[in-house]
Amino acid sequence: MSATLILEPPGRCCWNEPVRIAVRGLAPEQRVTLRASLRDEKGALFRAHARYCADARGELDLERAPALGGSFAGLEPMGLLWALEPEKPFWRFLKRDVQIPFVVELEVLDGHDPEPGRLLCQAQHERHFLPPGVRRQSVRAGRVRATLFLPPGPGPFPGIIDIFGIGGGLLEYRASLLAGHGFATLALAYYNFEDLPNNMDNISLEYFEEAVCYMLQHPQVKGPGIGLLGISLGADICLSMASFLKNVSATVSINGSGISGNTAINYKHSSIPPLGYDLRRIKVAFSGLVDIVDIRNALVGGYKNPSMIPIEKAQGPILLIVGQDDHNWRSELYAQTVSERLQAHGKEKPQIICYPGTGHYIEPPYFPLCPASLHRLLNKHVIWGGEPRAHSKAQEDAWKQILAFFCKHLGGTQKTAVPKL
């Protein structure tokens, strides 16, 4: 009897959904090595492997069988995805074209390391980023440069604006996945894209106000307010939008700081001065990587510092997602300072969820950890922090928390996928 790789769901599913991996037709207690690999849009190779032992019936189910070593160990049904590592050092795992799925190659080989034996069976699994029925619309409205993702069905739907960090450009993968959960989601570019500025001399909230108005005027978006989701600098822009703009019903910050960091944040006649930084505080770590966690100037006066975003002006609830091993900046300290500022002004504490062993780039579920990569502005490879297993678990939970938060405060229904064999 020949070995067979069984995947559930077979063929394809969304990246943020689990896939159940099993092997049948092995010899009783046969030792095997499972390998996973994929290439991103730039051809960069990512790989993971793990060693397993079949049961007495010659079957192997990754939901029941612990990995005996390799890229990970223990009971990790999705380990072959979250443990993927780039062949090229410090290469960040990203999805740039959500219309084309990633193709994961799965192989089962006889025996264990150092050199597994012959190939027993193999399969492909497509991991896509455009959920069934989700509609993708390019947006060029006034100054707004974005992509809108609409869920299947007649609508209208609760709306979210999704903003990324200092890398600029237009990243759509989080917005497209959110649309699969019933949210009309606008992936918004704000610099280094088409005719937008190539750098950030200052952050003008009037541009982001245009995006809010666009969403609320869209017939498929349900008002009266919208949600905001941002990571890193994008999170600080979202916190600023919540503080100054109308019709923001709920805000999620992923490893934001609540501070105007490197450049002023302006809205009409108001301006938040930048806190600033000192590159002399860069630390050189292993392999020539640099650690920038302490380059920002001290937050003198704590929550009263003039570079703090006036988050007490926000009308809707706030969720702060925090990686406790974030090496971009001191996210946990900043989250506590935001909370202190809100309480000092008689406002409710924000919801803060802290994840140990978790770095800066908290992505949708099953994204591999990016422990270090090239920093766009510094042009150096910097440490982002995180430990693979803890970071992966944090991403799974954070995604659930974000969906639940927006469902509660914007309206909507959650969808879950539980694969069964």
Swiss-Prot record:
Modified-residue entries (N6-succinyllysine), positions: K313
Signal peptide as annotated in the record: none
Active site (record annotation): S232 (charge relay system), D326 (charge relay system), H360 (charge relay system)
**Entry-linked Pfam families:** BAAT_C (PF08840), Bile_Hydr_Trans (PF04775)
What highest taxon heads this organism's lineage?
Answer: Eukaryota
| Alphabetized GO MF terms | carboxylic ester hydrolase activity; fatty acyl-CoA hydrolase activity; succinyl-CoA hydrolase activity
Instruction: State its location(s).
Output: Peroxisome
The record's annotation in Gene3D superfamilies points to:
Acyl-CoA thioester hydrolase/BAAT N-terminal domain, alpha/beta hydrolase
Q: Which reaction does it catalyse?
A: succinyl-CoA + H2O = succinate + CoA + H(+); glutaryl-CoA + H2O = glutarate + CoA + H(+); hexadecanoyl-CoA + H2O = hexadecanoate + CoA + H(+); (9Z)-octadecenoyl-CoA + H2O = (9Z)-octadecenoate + CoA + H(+)
The biological processes this protein is annotated with in GO are: acyl-CoA metabolic process; dicarboxylic acid catabolic process; dicarboxylic acid metabolic process; fatty acid biosynthetic process; fatty acid metabolic process; long-chain fatty acid metabolic process; saturated monocarboxylic acid metabolic process; short-chain fatty acid metabolic process
Which InterPro entries does this entry report, sorted A to Z?
AB_hydrolase_fold, Acyl-CoA_thioEstase_long-chain, BAAT_C, Thio_Ohase/aa_AcTrfase, Thio_Ohase/BAAT_N
**Keywords of the record:** Fatty acid metabolism, Hydrolase, Lipid metabolism, Peroxisome, Serine esterase
Pathway note: Lipid metabolism; fatty acid biosynthesis
What does the UniProt record say this protein does? Answer: Catalyzes the hydrolysis of acyl-CoAs into free fatty acids and coenzyme A (CoASH), regulating their respective intracellular levels. Functions as a peroxisomal succinyl-coenzyme A thioesterase that can also hydrolyze glutaryl-CoA and long chain saturated acyl-CoAs.
What family is this?
Belongs to the C/M/P thioester hydrolase family.
The protein in question is named Peroxisomal succinyl-coenzyme A thioesterase
Instruction: From the UniProt record, report the name of the gene that encodes this protein.
Output: ACOT4
